[in-house]
From Swiss-Prot:
Primary gene name: surE
Stated name of the protein: 5'-nucleotidase SurE
Native species: Natranaerobius thermophilus (strain ATCC BAA-1301 / DSM 18059 / JW/NM-WN-LF)
GO CC field: cytoplasm
Cell inner membrane is among the record's keywords: no
GO molecular function ontology, one term from the record: nucleotide binding
Length: 259
């Protein structure tokens, strides 16, 4: 199975290296890494249209795992597009985006470069996994990498259940493997932010702002990604790029408009 790895934390981030190490250690996978040359967190599904994209072979990383590592001066979506269309000799069977430093739960998926890298694969009709470790400071990515490889094998062995374009958003609690309760299939929960903009002034007296605030989560529904990771379950949420509100669509379809 040909696997393309990308992320939004940048090619030198420990999460993507741990993921690449896990995939490279398994005979059933053939991996290529194409990732941003710097951090691209919270870039959403942005693509680069006002400057050329450049690809560099990062040999010092590739030699460690004996797989190709390429950096791109663009976003995660750029990386996937460019890898599929120009860098790789063949279209990948699976794209894995991550392992992200920090959760991608609830509405995070709308801002996340990690999820957008996987979503770009879905748009290109490729199966994909977005994987995140639910802590910014936890340094052990090995458990998240192992669970992701396990899920990748399920996708590989059950092609009839996973159509091209399937996207699984995986969030792994930041605990030791023996503390995890298992894997739970979930839906997107409620997680957003209380936005606070801290106003400051530069030496010339001009105002500027830092965005701060805190996370607001609803953990009352145990079937959601937000609640499941709190209970130390690995959350797997199938998502797609079709944002149509079908209930409202059916209602509006009965409207009559004047010509």
């Amino acid at each position: 199975m040909k696997v393309l790895l990308t992320n939004d934390d940048g090619i030198y981030a420990p999460g993507i290296f741990a993921m690449a190490k896990e995939i490279a250690s398994r005979d059933e996978f053939e991996a290529v890494v194409v990732a941003p040359d710097r951090e691209q967190s919270a870039t959403g599904h942005a693509i680069t249209v006002h400057k050329p994209l450049r690809v560099n072979n990062v040999k010092k990383l590739g030699e460690k795992l004996e797989i190709p590592f390429y950096s791109v001066n663009g976003t995660p979506s750029d990386c996937v597009k460019l890898a599929v269309e120009s860098v790789m000799d063949e279209k990948p069977d699976l794209v894995i985006s991550g392992i992200n430093r920090g959760a991608n739960l609830g509405t995070d998926v709308l801002y996340s470069g990690t999820v957008s890298g996987a979503m770009e694969a879905a748009i290109l009709n490729i199966k994909s996994i977005a994987v995140s470790l639910v802590d910014y400071d936890y340094e052990d990515y090995s458990t998240a990498a192992s669970y992701t490889a396990y899920i990748a094998n399920i996708i590989k062995d059950n092609p009839e259940e996973f159509e091209n374009g399937t996207l699984l958003n995986v969030n792994v609690p930041a605990v030791e493997a023996n503390q995890l309760k298992g894997v739970k299939i979930t839906r997107q929960g409620f997680r957003q932010y209380e936005n606070i903009f801290e106003k400051r002034f530069d030496p010339r007296g001009k105002a500027y702002y830092w965005m701060a605030g805190k996370v607001i989560e609803d953990t009352s529904d145990i079937k959601t990604d937000v609640a499941s990771v709190k209970e130390n379950y690995v959350s797997v949420t199938p998502i797609k790029y079709d944002l149509t509100d079908y209930n409202l669509y059916n209602s509006l379809s009965n409207w009559e408009f004047d010509d």
